Amino acid sequence: MVPALRYLVGACGRARGLFAGGSPGACGFASGRPRPLCGGSRSASTSSFDIVIVGGGIVGLASARALILRHPSLSIGVLEKEKDLAVHQTGHNSGVIHSGIYYKPESLKAKLCVQGAALLYEYCQQKGISYKQCGKLIVAVEQEEIPRLQALYEKGLQNGVPGLRLIQQEDIKKKEPYCRGLMAIDCPHTGIVDYRQVALSFAQDFQEAGGSVLTNFEVKGIEMAKESPSRSIDGMQYPIVIKNTKGEEIRCQYVVTCAGLYSDRISELSGCTPDPRIVPFRGDYLLLKPEKCYLVKGNIYPVPDSRFPFLGVHFTPRMDGSIWLGPNAVLAFKREGYRPFDFSATDVMDIIINSGLIKLASQNFSYGVTEMYKACFLGATVKYLQKFIPEITISDILRGPAGVRAQALDRDGNLVEDFVFDAGVGDIGNRILHVRNAPSPAATSSIAISGMIADEVQQRFEL
């Protein structure tokens, strides 16, 4: 007999569904700041869904919301391995609403970021979620950076980023009085928000529409059912079995995985390809002391170096008024390793046997050494920051939080730059859709991504 599962869902009613017993309803929260999800439970005999989303981060929750709003007659559930939602990449990022300037023209990142930023601002206004459209300067501090800055500006225009302009020293000072620079791109549509608050609002919308959220459900297997469950009246209507580490299982017709740092492993569990592999990069942030936060008004970014895969250390205001400096980018020895000495033997073994990572490390050895040096010595990071704001000293800096970025890597050692969506082959492959690579700007793009996923699900699964 399948053990009963605990759901973080409303117990106020029943939603429509395509299986016996329906789905727990929502508690009718008013719009505005997301409230805690209300508790409820369901018996094992009704642990079946038409669609299951694996992963309770911002992309998974946005996708669940989009699907249930488009298909209100379907029963849809979200599985999350933690006791709370949106606690990893969604809850450990800089909170920047990106404009879409950095990405290759015509790529999914470029299209979905520009579209997603506009949708996100609109959503926050509708829901009363606080945000600040504080803008961003991408600043050239050396003469040799100016051609790269101008090329980036042209890329932004190709991507349709609104409001971009090139500005000179005097205009840089008007926007950021303490920032030095020769030339900058002014990105007025860049902003900041608390993405966990946005994700919890998505979850609230999902539940109000009749969706169900299961926490503490760590998936360890996804397979096709071999027979009907004991005492089931559904027979083989729900042919996919999803099992967790506690021996519990649910059944469903279709699966969408949005597993972030574990997207490759979840794909492999379902019998699909593990490639591209996920490599975890930890990013450490520093904090400006409160009495020095006046030095920064909006986002200040360096000109990215196309030889290296990350954007570089930058200045980021937060919704609480603090200023974050960073992040760096160093290889993490645990997929959820937020501290320098966090270690997982399984994750390290993945790193050792990953031929693509060995190639990446050899191609970017000097960059990696520099990032490790900055992570260990505050003075090195401060020296870099002083290129932009000379007034900053090491006594103005505190160590801050960290995040871990899930970055897909191919077998040739190339970082997969665009969003990747994949499916498998055979019976289960026809019933599953994997979100395989969704690093930054996935949070900014989450509403746009969810619309694309809903389109793909509708077409692929013939809903």
From Swiss-Prot:
Class of this enzyme: oxidoreductase
SUPFAM superfamilies per record: FAD/NAD(P)-binding domain
Transit peptide start-stop: 1-51
Documented EC number(s): 1.1.99.2
Gene Ontology biological process: 2-oxoglutarate metabolic process; small molecule metabolic process
Annotated phenotype, changing E176D: In L2HGA; alters protein processing and abolishes catalytic activity
Modified residues (N6-acetyllysine): K104, K155, K173
Catalysed reactions, semicolon-separated: (S)-2-hydroxyglutarate + A = 2-oxoglutarate + AH2
Keyword flag Repeat: no
Keyword terms of this UniProt record: Acetylation, Disease variant, FAD, Flavoprotein, Mitochondrion, Oxidoreductase, Transit peptide
Tissue-level expression: Widely expressed. Highly expressed in brain, testis and muscle. Expressed to a lower extent in lymphocytes, fibroblasts, keratinocytes, placenta, bladder, small intestine, liver and bone marrow.
Cofactor: FAD
GO cellular component: membrane; mitochondrial inner membrane; mitochondrion
Pfam families, sorted: DAO
Domain of life assignment: Eukaryota
InterPro entries: FAD-dep_OxRdtase, FAD/NAD-bd_sf
An annotated Gene Ontology molecular function: 2-hydroxyglutarate dehydrogenase activity
Signal peptide: none
Localization, UniProt: Mitochondrion
Similarity comment: family membership: Belongs to the L2HGDH family.
Other remarks in the entry: Was named 'duranin' in honor of Marinus Duran, who first described L-2-hydroxyglutaric aciduria.
Disease involvement: L-2-hydroxyglutaric aciduria: A rare autosomal recessive disorder clinically characterized by mild psychomotor delay in the first years of life, followed by progressive cerebellar ataxia, dysarthria and moderate to severe intellectual disability. Diagnosis is based on the presence of an excess of L-2-hydroxyglutaric acid in urine, blood and cerebrospinal fluid.
Name of the protein: L-2-hydroxyglutarate dehydrogenase, mitochondrial
Organism this protein belongs to: Homo sapiens
Lineage: Eukaryota, Metazoa, Chordata, Craniata, Vertebrata
Annotated gene: L2HGDH
